[in-house]
Regions:
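Catalytic loop of short-chain dehydrogenase/reductase
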Residues: 1-56, 65
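Low-complexity, compositionally biased segments
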Residues: 8-10, 73, 96
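A short C-terminal helix-loop "cap" of Rossmann-like NAD(P)-dependent dehydrogenase/epimerase domains
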Residues: 16-23, 68-72, 88-92
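A general structural-boundary detector
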Residues: 26-29, 61, 76-78
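Short beta-loop-alpha junction of Rossmann-like oxidoreductase domains
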Residues: 53-54, 68-78
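Short helix-terminating capping/connector loops at secondary-structure junctions
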Residues: 54-58, 103-105
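C-terminal helical subdomain
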Residues: 63, 71, 78-127
Length: 127
């Protein structure tokens, strides 16, 4: 899959939402889920395509999930924000990824609090 293929998939999803056909096509009701999947897939595809150059240059490309963050945008969607991080707290893990030693096992993965979150069972993204 290429970034163009993913872009078309996400455009098709957006069209299905607008037309009211998304549920009938098997998409989840909550639009946050497909949008986050699209974001992570884009990073994984980009990381796959850039791996050789990134490794030579000492770059780490990962998708980061900070977890629940207490922001004005998230409050309307969650009734219990007691476990949410502040934006500053959420930024700590991102800064550590940026400034710390590179863990090549994290390359192209979804990372939360310094740990890889399995996307699915280990699977290669097809070209």
């Amino acid at each position: 899959m290429s970034l163009d293929d993913l872009d078309q998939t996400m455009r098709d999803y957006a069209d299905a939402v607008r037309s009211g056909a998304a549920a009938g096509q098997g998409w989840p009701e909550w639009i946050n889920i497909p949008s986050k999947i699209g974001q992570v897939a884009a990073v994984r595809i980009y990381a796959r395509d850039q791996r050789e150059q990134a490794m030579r240059d000492g770059q780490l490309i990962v998708a980061v999930c900070p977890g629940l963050v207490d922001t004005r945008a998230s409050r309307p969607w969650f009734t219990d924000m007691s476990q949410a991080q502040s934006p500053g707290q959420a930024a700590i893990d991102v800064v550590k990824l940026d400034t710390g030693p590179i863990d090549t096992q994290m390359y192209g993965e979804l990372v939360q609090h310094g740990r890889i979150i399995p996307w699915t069972e280990p699977a290669a993204i097809p070209n």
